[in-house]
Every structure is written in structure tokens, then in C-alpha cells.
Swiss-Prot record:
<feature type="binding site">
    <location>
        <position position="154"/>
    </location>
    <ligand>
        <name>Zn(2+)</name>
    </ligand>
</feature>
<dbReference type="GO" id="GO:0046526">
    <property type="term" value="F:D-xylulose reductase activity"/>
</dbReference>
<keyword id="KW-0862">Zinc</keyword>
<keyword id="KW-0520">NAD</keyword>
<dbReference type="InterPro" id="IPR013149">
    <property type="entry name" value="ADH-like_C"/>
</dbReference>
<dbReference type="InterPro" id="IPR045306">
    <property type="entry name" value="SDH-like"/>
</dbReference>
<protein>
    <recommendedName>
        <fullName>Putative D-xylulose reductase</fullName>
        <ecNumber>1.1.1.9</ecNumber>
    </recommendedName>
</protein>
<dbReference type="InterPro" id="IPR002328">
    <property type="entry name" value="ADH_Zn_CS"/>
</dbReference>
<dbReference type="InterPro" id="IPR013154">
    <property type="entry name" value="ADH-like_N"/>
</dbReference>
<dbReference type="InterPro" id="IPR011032">
    <property type="entry name" value="GroES-like_sf"/>
</dbReference>
<keyword id="KW-0560">Oxidoreductase</keyword>
<keyword id="KW-0479">Metal-binding</keyword>
<feature type="binding site">
    <location>
        <position position="43"/>
    </location>
    <ligand>
        <name>Zn(2+)</name>
    </ligand>
</feature>
<feature type="binding site">
    <location>
        <position position="68"/>
    </location>
    <ligand>
        <name>Zn(2+)</name>
    </ligand>
</feature>
<comment type="similarity">
    <text>Belongs to the zinc-containing alcohol dehydrogenase family.</text>
</comment>
<dbReference type="Pfam" id="PF00107">
    <property type="entry name" value="ADH_zinc_N"/>
</dbReference>
<dbReference type="InterPro" id="IPR036291">
    <property type="entry name" value="NAD(P)-bd_dom_sf"/>
</dbReference>
Length: 350
């Protein structure tokens, strides 16, 4: 099958590619479904593998198919699958854990060391015409949720995970540092989770303008205003209940404690490329609770339900739809990191 293949750092190709034992090739297991891929989002991790050839200790040592934010249509079901049928429109959770692991038994399968996650070396991704996937990690899309929205469930699930880790109370005020795609997802999940107001801070005014179109969102351009002073003014000097750090930027991480109220929460979502300093005393002096986020667990069905309900509208965050045959150009556009782009999506031939 033709696939978008990362041959090596900085080199992509569209070519026939055999994926041994999975992602569309091989035999269908009794608990699997075969899916005709429809829409695949371009994620920052895909782009990072393209430009750097690695993320942390995950290194691309051999050609790898990219893509993990996906939706499609079921075209075959395994003999034991009962909740899905041929023709169902679905989205797919891309990380498959070992169900017998201690992490999975604890319900934290996202941190299972044995998890097999699409487009994370050595596991191939889903930018192929068909994939085989466990039915247990495949979710039917309601009729009012499009394929494009279905492919947005994966990044929104990270926002859902962050909102759950924050333990939001109704009426909380939150700050999100970083208005990239994940920062925007976190902001919308925080609103859906009960926050009365979410303040989003970034350097890029075009991104702030996009997220500011949502009710309940206020924005601060930190090129123009001091963030700590602005948050203090917005909260009568008390500070926000929750800080979601989504930029991974060292200055933002160092300044987190100044934004939070005493007894508030810090949720670390963004991933710094290198180790960064943290103001431990600043955290201690306010007895701030610190939470971390790595992917997600047990939130996909909730994410789909929120989108279907209309309480979360992700369509304005889709900046462009790119045909599969132009996907290399799409990735090159993603590398440009245009300030007006949030999510680029690739549509597969049908």
C-alpha cells in the first residue's frame, strides 16, 4: 500500500510500503477491525521526527510511516467484535498498551512502558489507505461528527487528560501558557470541564485571535503585557486556580508559580526539548499542587461525546485540508509553523 514514509531525518516519500504484521497488512485478529483511513492530522510530533529524526530516546533508525490522529470507516471486523460493524465511521486511539501490565491494571495505560503508539519508533503510523486496529481502541463517530472532527479527537484527548488531572472545580479560573494546537485543546477542555474563564497567553497574536473567538476565553499577548501582572489584575490579586503550562518554554515554566493562587494547581502539558529550571521555592511557598500529563487514558469516549454534544467545536481550528498526494508539501507547510495555522489535516483517497 502507498504510504507517507519518513525515510530518514529530513526526507519524506510517498511510496508503496509493506508494514509487517499491522497497520493494514497482515491477518485480521478476532478482536480487530480493518479501517479505510479517511482523515489524518499532522501532529507536532510527526513534524519533529521529520525535522530532527528523534524525540528523546525514540529515534528513527529505519523508514517509518507517519501519522496518528485518524478517522476512517470500518471495512472488516474480527469474529469477536460486536460493537462495530462494516460501514461504521470511527476514530482510533493510537496507543495500544499491554492489557496485562501493572500500568494498564491501574488504569494508567498511557504510561505503560510496553505501549505501542502509532508513529513512535519502531511502530508505524496510519498515513496509509488502510489500518488494522484493536476494536477496543476504535470509537464509533456519531452522525453529527465529521471525519475531520474525528481526527481531532486525538489532540483534544490530551486537553481532556489535562482537565482531569487539574481536578477542575466549577467556576475555576485557569491560565494556559502557549496557544499552539495543544494549548488551544487544553483551553477548550478546561471550559468544558467547568472553568468559568480561561486566560490564554502567547507571543503570536494570530493564534490568540483564533482562540479568542470562543466564549469564555480571554487572551494576553506577552509581548505587550507582563503575564503575572495581567493575571493578578484579572483575579483581584489572588491568582488563578489552575495554570496549564503548554508551551514547554523555559521562561514560562520558571514563571508558573507567580500566576497561581495559594493552594492552586500547576499542570505540566508542554514538553521542553531540554531540561529546564523550576522555581521549587515558589511552588512550595504557595503549596501548589503539580500534575503532569503524558498522552491520555480513558478519555476518548468522553472527548467524542463532548464534540457530538456541541459543547466543544473544534472545526475552527482546522486550518487546511490537504490531499494525500500533496502530503509532503503539507508537512513542509507544517514545518514553517505559520502563526495562522493550528491544525493541518490530510485526506486519504476514498
Amino acid at each position: 500500500m502507498k504510504a507517507l514514509v519518513l525515510e530518514e531525518k529530513g526526507k519524506l516519500s510517498l511510496r508503496d510500503f509493506d508494514i509487517p504484521g499491522g497497520a493494514g497488512s497482515g491477518e485480521l485478529g478476532p478482536k480487530d477491525v480493518r479501517i479505510r483511513t479517511h482523515t489524518v492530522g499532522i501532529c507536532g510530533s510527526d513534524v519533529h521526527y521529520y525535522t530532527h529524526g528523534k524525540i528523546g530516546h525514540f529515534v528513527v533508525n529505519a523508514p517509518m510511516v507517519l501519522g496518528h490522529e485518524a478517522s476512517g470507516t470500518v471495512i472488516e471486523t474480527g469474529s469477536d467484535v460486536t460493537h462495530l460493524k462494516i460501514g461504521d465511521r470511527v476514530c482510533m486511539e493510537p496507543g495500544i498498551p499491554d492489557p496485562t501490565s501493572r500500568a494498564s491494571k491501574l488504569g494508567i495505560y498511557n504510561v505503560d512502558p510496553a505501549v505501542r503508539f502509532w508513529a513512535t519508533p519502531p511502530i508505524h503510523g496510519c498515513l496509509t489507505p488502510e489500518v488494522i486496529h484493536p476494536a477496543a481502541f476504535t470509537y464509533k463517530l456519531p452522525d453529527n461528527v465529521s471525519f475531520a472532527e474525528g481526527a481531532m479527537v486525538e489532540p483534544f484527548a490530551i486537553g481532556m487528560q489535562a482537565a482531569l488531572r487539574a481536578r477542575i472545580q466549577p467556576g475555576d479560573i485557569a491560565v494556559v501558557t502557549g496557544a499552539g494546537p495543544i494549548g488551544m485543546m487544553v483551553a477548550l477542555a478546561a471550559l468544558a470541564g467547568g472553568c468559568a474563564k480561561v486566560i490564554v497567553a502567547d507571543l503570536a497574536q494570530p493564534k490568540l485571535d483564533i482562540i479568542a473567538a470562543y466564549d469564555g476565553i480571554e487572551t494576553i499577548n506577552i509581548r505587550e503585557r507582563n503575564l503575572a501582572e495581567a493575571v493578578s489584575a484579572a483575579t483581584d490579586g489572588w491568582g488563578c486556580d489552575i495554570v496549564f503550562e503548554c508551551s514547554g518554554a523555559a521562561p514560562a515554566i520558571l514563571g508558573m508559580a507567580k500566576l497561581a493562587r495559594p493552594g492552586g494547581a500547576i499542570v505540566l502539558v508542554g514538553m521542553p526539548v531540554d531540561p529546564v529550571p523550576v522555581d521549587i521555592v515558589g511552588l512550595q511557598a504557595k503549596e501548589l499542587r503539580v500534575e503532569t500529563v503524558f498522552r491520555y487514558a480513558n478519555v476518548y469516549d468522553r472527548a467524542v461525546a463532548l464534540i457530538a454534544s456541541g459543547k466543544v467545536d473544534l472545526k475552527p481550528l482546522i486550518s487546511a485540508t490537504i490531499p494525500f498526494e500533496d502530503s509532503i508539501a503539507g508537512f513542509d507547510r507544517a514545518v514553517e509553523a505559520r502563526e495562522t495555522d493550528v491544525k493541518l489535516q490530510i485526506v486519504m483517497p476514498q
